[in-house]
């Protein structure tokens, strides 16, 4: 078996909770022989509170559910038109530290955006990726048994208004942006393969396989 191989699942538009549960079950059940996986998904509208999340950062949730998550970080919003990429990696096997993985994911996004002519950067004081002062990608991870789960959420072509109902990632007045502002035709379907390709490049091009959407 090629332990280095990564399986890539395109899950489409899904509610948050069943995918979160499946991700936990996958991580709990995995052993040394379990292949790493990348899950690509868009979520129905939902606010998720990270482990460090404070209730006061959820300002006016209205009709959008607020769900507690065990990822790192504070509150964020997921909705259609945002590409979520969950990274289910055995860090020990890949000889990656947690900080290295965060840097690698941020660089994956920076490299992907550069392909679309969008200049972006990470910030030392606030994980994620930014275009100027505006946030375009949120990042939150959890490590269990030396394996990562959760991942990143890249704003592509979505309704950004729900972000006004929260202090994104715990920062009052944090402005959000998305790829559509620079590339009007862009969609999660077109960006996802570039995101995966850039992640695989930074992981030194491991063998990989796209699984058919179920």
Curated annotation (Swiss-Prot):
In the reaction, the free carboxyl group of octanoic acid is attached via an amide linkage to the epsilon-amino group of a specific lysine residue of lipoyl domains of lipoate-dependent enzymes. Catalyzes the transfer of endogenously produced octanoic acid from octanoyl-acyl-carrier-protein onto the lipoyl domains of lipoate-dependent enzymes. Lipoyl-ACP can also act as a substrate although octanoyl-ACP is likely to be the physiological substrate. It catalyses: octanoyl-[ACP] + L-lysyl-[protein] = N(6)-octanoyl-L-lysyl-[protein] + holo-[ACP] + H(+). Residues 32-207 form the BPL/LPL catalytic domain. It is an enzyme of class 2 (transferase). NCBIfam families: lipB (TIGR00214), PRK14342.1 (NF010922). The lineage of its organism: Bacteria, Pseudomonadati, Pseudomonadota, Gammaproteobacteria, Enterobacterales. It comes from Klebsiella pneumoniae (strain 342). It holds the Pfam family LplA-B_cat. Its EC number is 2.3.1.181. HAMAP family: LipB. This is Octanoyltransferase. Belongs to the LipB family. GO terms for cellular component: cytoplasm. The gene is lipB. It is found in: Cytoplasm. The record marks 135 as: Lowers pKa of active site Cys. Substrate binds at residues 71-78, 138-140, 151-153.
């Amino acid at each position: 078996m090629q332990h280095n191989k990564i399986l890539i699942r395109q899950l489409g538009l899904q509610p948050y909770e069943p995918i979160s549960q499946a991700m936990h079950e996958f991580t709990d059940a995995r052993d040394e022989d379990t292949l790493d996986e990348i899950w690509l998904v868009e979520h129905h509208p939902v606010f998720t509170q990270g482990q460090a999340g404070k209730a006061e950062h959820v300002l006016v949730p209205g009709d959008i559910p607020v769900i507690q998550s065990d990822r790192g970080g504070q509150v964020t919003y997921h909705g259609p038109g945002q590409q979520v990429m969950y990274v289910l990696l055995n860090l020990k096997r890949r000889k990656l530290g947690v900080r290295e993985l965060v840097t690698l994911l941020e660089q994956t996004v920076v490299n992907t955006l550069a392909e679309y002519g969008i200049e972006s950067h990470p910030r030392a004081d606030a994980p994620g990726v930014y275009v100027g002062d505006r946030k375009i990608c949120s990042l939150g991870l959890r490590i269990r048994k030396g394996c990562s789960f959760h991942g990143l959420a890249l704003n592509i072509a979505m309704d950004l208004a729900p972000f006004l109902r929260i202090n994104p990632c715990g920062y009052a007045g944090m402005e959000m942006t998305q790829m559509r502002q620079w590339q009007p035709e862009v969609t999660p379907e077109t960006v996802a393969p570039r995101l995966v390709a850039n992640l695989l490049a930074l992981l030194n091009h491991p063998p990989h396989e796209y699984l058919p959407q179920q």
